[in-house]
């Protein structure tokens, strides 16, 4: 059984009070790329988490970037994950992991090895569909948003599709699995802005920066289902 890191201490999930109900508790999360045992954009992930913690719960955290980086490297080693490339999930529990807890706690899990050693652009024509489902505190990486994205994915797969773009009650496409959805028309790339409910992420910042470096005009505008029918390409990013 893989170990996890709870508040800096390495433990087996079976030793936690109730590992399944724990993940149903309110929490914030980040999926983190690691290359060679390190997380190159860890500061961005921690910035997003601390901002969400402050805005949603009015709380501050003293998460140390150097300590979290050390715990990630050690956890990958303990669980014998390949150093080349892996995905790690960092969860922040503002109300604690157990019912009786009264402090903010964090959990680090090794998720899965990744196929590629670095970021890779690849082209695969996957079937995309949309699902209308609003999450509480839209625009933040919450457990509620995670459940809504999973619901959308299962719904689309039952329809025979592969990717689910989640749509809010106003008909705005928020993203795919918590990551940005972009549509490309000519030399223009459009994506839903954070102010319209899209979620900030390290991958979002990277892909928008890459588009600008390639000379594309990046426009943040609320995407709709109808816009998918008129674009040249639709693309998203994933920790894989």
What is each of the regions a protein language model found here?
Residues 81-92:
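Ordered, amphipathic secondary-structure segments that act as subunit-interaction surfaces
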Residues 1-74, 95-240:
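Helix-start/capping segments and mature chain N-termini
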């Amino acid at each position: 059984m893989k170990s996890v890191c709870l508040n800096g201490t390495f433990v087996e999930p079976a030793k936690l009070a109730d590992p399944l109900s724990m993940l149903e508790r309110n929490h914030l999360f980040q999926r983190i790329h690691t290359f060679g045992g390190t997380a190159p954009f860890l500061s961005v992930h921690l910035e997003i988490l601390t901002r969400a913690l402050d805005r949603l719960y009015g709380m501050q955290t003293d998460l140390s970037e150097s300590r979290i980086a050390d715990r990630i490297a050690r956890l990958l080693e303990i669980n014998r994950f390949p150093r080349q490339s892996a995905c790690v999930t960092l969860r922040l529990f503002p109300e604690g992991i157990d019912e009786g807890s009264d402090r903010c706690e964090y959990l680090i899990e090794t998720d899965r090895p990744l196929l590629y050693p670095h970021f890779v652009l690849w082209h695969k024509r996957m079937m995309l569909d949309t699902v209308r489902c609003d999450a509480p505190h839209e625009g933040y990486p919450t457990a509620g948003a995670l459940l809504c994205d999973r619901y959308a994915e299962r719904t689309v797969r039952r329809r025979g599709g592969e990717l689910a773009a989640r749509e809010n009650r106003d008909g705005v496409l928020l993203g795919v699995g918590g990551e940005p959805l972009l549509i490309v028309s000519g030399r223009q790339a459009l994506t839903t802005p954070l102010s319209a409910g899209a979620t900030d992420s390290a991958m979002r910042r990277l892909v928008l920066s890459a588009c600008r470096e390639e000379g594309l005009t990046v426009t943040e505008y609320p995407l709709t289902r109808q816009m998918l029918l008129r674009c040249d390409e639709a693309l998203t990013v994933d920790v894989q």
